[in-house]
Amino acid sequence: MYNLNALIDRLIEISINNNLIEDMDTVYTRNRLLSLFNENSYTPCEEKLTLSFHETLNELINIAIEKKIIENALYSKDIFSSDIMNIFLPTPSLINKEFYKRYAISPKESTDYFYSLSKSSNYIRTDRIAKNINFKAPSKYGTMDITINLSKPEKDPKEIALARNSVKSNYPKCLLCIENEGYEGTVTHPDRANHRMIRLDLNDRTWMLQYSPYLYYNEHCIILSEDHVPMKIDISTFKNLLSFVDKFPHYFTGSNADLPIVGGSILSHEHYQGGNHRFPMNDAKKLFDFSIEGFEDVECEAIKWPISTIRLRGENIDSLVLASDLILKKWRDYSDETLDILAYSNSEMHNTITPMVRKEDGKFVVDLSLRNNRTSKEHPLGIFHPHEEVHHIKKENIGLIEVMGLAVLPGRLLKELEKIKEYLRDEISLDNIEEYHRPWALELKKKFDYLKSSTDLNDFVNKELSNKFVSVLEHCGVFKLNEEGLEGFKRFTNSLNS
């Protein structure tokens, strides 16, 4: 085991290099770290370590376990590592002052500062994110982004039992609330001692900007309401999204829908997501264009995308807000029984929108994906939700990130796809493959046996996985991209002028 003093010196050295602290802070920081380890003396160590940041942090955690300061459990180790890094961080007020000092130079400089801080403090878990499998694969709608999510470690049975038997707390109320800032964490609530948020004013309401601890794309940020209020999509949503992009034109932002099945995993706290990433949907081609009376300064088109989406372009924020609100209100009450679209069932609302905003070539671009959460006997999880035949790949809600063409697929697929590759190479029998994958594996075998002389196996499986994800998205489209669906889409856009 490494010497504690040498590890402390190494972590301080790394943090100075990462601009978390300055040389002047060395003695103070060292003493605060010694206190965490119940030590009250320090002897300089001749041994100079060259460990990486995460290696150093992990070795410090091992010493804490050895000294019985913490348990050898994931939640306990995470809490302790956040306590360590919190020592290196300024208070929220100082971070906000620095952010806005840099914002006066440029919006990008301010987000670069906060993003770097969030990584250097280990709030963004870059070590775990690096485990994800990411690749791009072609599809009939363009190149899709595929991620197999391996970043979130699994809890062991002991921790699961501890969580099940622990006393439930309503503080913080949810994973997003402002009360998470600096929160120690428990077996049931993640560590947040090293968590900081930037205060934003969007349309006379206070919002918080933070980065996601488990990024799915570059600079994946979350913009959350200061108040714990439910998700909603209305005119204020469009005002907020456009206001955010106006303040940070190098970022996109968007919102999950506000209804179950088609919404995200957290409906209880109003929030948006954003970041510095170009998604496959951004490059979707025009399906047809149309106009809306009274909005001559707004370009309107439907795009060729599996989830039915209207794209608006313009320079005037007020016009885009009002045009988006008109489309939302029309869609809320729109029914087309020939396409299984019903706005209400016994007063239960079914129609909503997943909106996204970005700035491109001097204009704001607003994408409005039309969603419906109705269920049926044939599709009890949702008519416009991934159907049963694709559940072996993805059965969870299709939220904002997936709508834009980035698949976030379960970690189990990593081993399961390797088995399928072994089957395609004739190394194992079909019986060795999970039962829910077998129909797909048989289908792939027929294709690959025909193509294998000219096709790389990994590329083939990646492309077929991408095609399966496209099917997931197509199931969610309210206006299918066939003649009947296209006519239905045009009926809806025509109704915007009635």
Curated annotation (Swiss-Prot):
Its main location: cytoplasm. Pfam families: GalP_UDP_tr_C, GalP_UDP_transf. PROSITE patterns: GAL_P_UDP_TRANSF_II. It is found in: Cytoplasm. Belongs to the galactose-1-phosphate uridylyltransferase type 2 family. GO terms for cellular component: cytoplasm. Pathway: Carbohydrate metabolism; galactose metabolism. The keyword Nucleotidyltransferase applies. It catalyses: alpha-D-galactose 1-phosphate + UDP-alpha-D-glucose = alpha-D-glucose 1-phosphate + UDP-alpha-D-galactose. InterPro entries: GalP_uridyl_Trfase_II (IPR000766), GalP_uridyl_Trfase_II_CS (IPR023425), GalP_Utransf_C (IPR005850), GalP_Utransf_N (IPR005849). GO terms for molecular function: UDP-glucose:hexose-1-phosphate uridylyltransferase activity. One of its GO terms (biological process) is galactose metabolic process. Keywords: Carbohydrate metabolism, Cytoplasm, Galactose metabolism, Nucleotidyltransferase, Transferase. Its EC number is 2.7.7.12. The keyword Transcription does not apply. It comes from the Bacteria. It is an enzyme of class 2 (transferase). This is Galactose-1-phosphate uridylyltransferase.
